[in-house]
A protein has these predicted regions:
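Loop-centered beta-sheet repeat module
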Residues: 1-2
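Claisen-condensing/thiolase-fold acyl-transfer catalytic domains that form or cleave C-C bonds
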Residues: 23-130
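Phosphate/pyrophosphate-binding loops at sites that engage ATP/ADP/AMP, CoA/4′-phosphopantetheine
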Residues: 7-21, 88-89
């Protein structure tokens, strides 16, 4: 979530964009826990994305499966983007998205030693063009 937060904040600032300029802001994957953390971090900067945000990890599982931390970032981001969002963009149902592939280097040893978890978020804008 911290990397997605920084990337979204920087993107909006660098390109003079607003959240409202996007039909969806898509992450892959933060899961339920990470999405809530992202909302909290962005709200601290006066940025509200909850009504436009979709997370590939959250979409891949039903709420009954109780997978609070999502799926495999690279796997679910590619799967959900290509099977769910790209057809909607191609048809024009969705016009513009900010897509962030998120990832973290999860090391049980580092976590047990109290070290931080390195994370990254790459962003790309995908648009439907008539």
């Amino acid at each position: 979530a911290p990397a997605a937060f920084k990337t979204i904040k920087t993107h909006l600032s660098d390109y003079s964009r607003r959240v409202e300029d996007y039909d969806r802001i898509i992450t892959g994957d933060l899961g339920i826990f990470g999405s809530d953390m992202l909302y909290e971090l962005l709200r601290g900067e006066g940025i509200e994305i909850a009504d436009r945000h979709e997370d590939c990890g959250k979409l891949m599982f039903s709420p009954e499966q109780n997978v609070n931390c999502g799926a495999s970032g690279c796997g679910c981001a590619a799967t959900v983007m290509s099977s769910w969002f790209l057809p909607k963009i191609e048809s024009g149902e969705i016009r513009r998205v900010l897509f962030l592939a998120t990832g973290a280097l999860m090391s049980p040893v580092s976590s047990l030693q109290g070290e931080s978890i390195p994370s990254i978020a790459h962003a790309v804008v995908i648009e439907h063009i008539d």
